[in-house]
C-alpha cells in the first residue's frame, strides 16, 4: 500500500517518463462498504486534497502552524486515525491510493470529529514532489510497505536511494523517517539503503532497529503476528542536514 520508488524529472520529456515509472503499488478493485462510501461522499470535499502544481501552504489548510507528520500507505487508516486522535496538537497528512481505505479513514474522521487530518488519494511520490515544501515535515511514516519478496520485483520496493533523498529534502533538520516492516529481510534491505543515504543518522543504539515506539499504534494484524511468533522491525532515521 505504498507508492512509486523513483523521482520524476520535471520536464515535458519527464512527464512522459513519469508515466513509465515503476510503481511500488498495484491498484486493486474492491467493494465499498456503506461506511466507506459515506466517508468519501461526505468527507472527501473537505478532507481530500488535490494534487497541486506548487507546494501547499498547510498552515492555511489546517488554520494553524503545528508539528506535521505524513504517512505513506495508511491502508484502512486505523493507525493514522489513532495517532491523529491522540495528538490533537499535531497535524497529519495521509496518502493512500486504494479507495476503500480512503473511505474508511474519512468515515473515521467524520465519526470522531477530527480536524487535524488531511488526505491525498494518489501516488505519494507525486505528492512529495508537487505538494510538500522542502524542509517542512517533522516526521514521515512508512508502516508495513509491500516488501515485494521476489528478487525480480525488488525494483518495485518504495525504499530506494532516490526515495531516501526525496524524503530527506522534505523533512526539517531533526525530522524523523520512521519505517516498520514485519519481514526481516526487508528490514535488512531498508538498513542497507538508509545506512549509506547521506544526511541521516540511525537512531538505533546498535545501528540497526529501534524498540517499537509507543507512538506507533499496534494493529490487529501485528497482534496476530505476535501471537504466532512473528516479529516487527522499526527503523528510525533523523535528518541531520
From Swiss-Prot:
Pfam families: Methyltransf_4 (PF02390). GO terms for molecular function: tRNA (guanine(46)-N7)-methyltransferase activity. It catalyses: guanosine(46) in tRNA + S-adenosyl-L-methionine = N(7)-methylguanosine(46) in tRNA + S-adenosyl-L-homocysteine. Residues 1-20 are annotated as: Disordered. The active site is at 146. It comes from the Bacteria. Keywords: Methyltransferase, S-adenosyl-L-methionine, Transferase, tRNA processing. NCBIfam families: tRNA (guanosine(46)-N7)-methyltransferase TrmB. Belongs to the class I-like SAM-binding methyltransferase superfamily. TrmB family. This is tRNA (guanine-N(7)-)-methyltransferase. The gene is trmB.
